[in-house]
Amino acid sequence: MAKQIFYTLFLFLLSTAILTASSSAPRAAITSKRAINFIQASCKATTYPTVCVNSLTGYANSIQTSPRRLAETALNVTVTQAQSTKVFVWRLGRFTSLKKREIQAVKDCIEEIHDAVDRLTMSIHEVKMCGSAKGRDQFWFHMSNAQTWTSAALTNANTCSDGFAGRVMDGRVKNSVRARILNLGRGTSNALALINAFAKKY
């Protein structure tokens, strides 16, 4: 008798678990689809929409349909990209075969990227503060800071790239660095566009 009761209870719990799993799966799929659609629509406002979609779609479940989380995620992705670029340029600077001008350009670029990382990190903080701002004035104070820091980070990326311009620079060094910086600049530009779009939603 006890075994029969236990078996019946087991079947009941198992069927409940299956029903719960089967009902939550479509909901998760719908949520993810809505989030992806939101990301795709939002990225149309950026200068590099394909880069925007490809870099942010993987975070759809955390972004959902929040303009603030979208901007914040774009900044986080760009910070990671900037840190990776900084390491790449630093390793490049350790090559003894570099010319004197190339060595100086690498050093200057590392400083620019370091500043970009700091400014993007501060921008992330400001965007977060926008989410808890009390009143219009407080929101725009943090928003203005976020826009300023991100714009400055974009300038840092462009300044680094300019240091490798001209025919004097070695083709391999110039091309490898500028390709990385180009991608960083695009990510930063997109993040700034999404911050501006978030501001318009307020």
From Swiss-Prot:
Residues 1-21 form the signal peptide. It is found in: Secreted, Extracellular space, Apoplast. The keyword Ubl conjugation does not apply. SMART domains: PMEI. Pfam families: PMEI (PF04043). One of its GO terms (biological process) is plant-type cell wall organization or biogenesis. Its main location: secreted. It comes from Arabidopsis thaliana (Mouse-ear cress). GO terms for cellular component: apoplast. Glycans are attached at N76. Belongs to the PMEI family. Disulfide bonds join C43-C52, C109-C160. This is Pectinesterase inhibitor 11. Induction: Induced in leaves during infection by Botrytis cinerea. Disruption phenotype: No visible phenotype under normal growth conditions, but mutant plants have enhanced susceptibility to infection by the necrotrophic pathogen Botrytis cinerea. Pectin methylesterase (PME) inhibitor involved in the maintenance of cell wall integrity in response to necrotrophic pathogens. Modulates PME activity and pectin methylesterification during infection by Botrytis cinerea and contributes to resistance against the pathogen. InterPro entries: Invertase/methylesterase_inhib, Pectinesterase_inhib_dom, PME_Inhibitor. GO terms for molecular function: pectinesterase inhibitor activity. Coiled coil: none annotated. Keywords: Apoplast, Disulfide bond, Glycoprotein, Secreted, Signal.
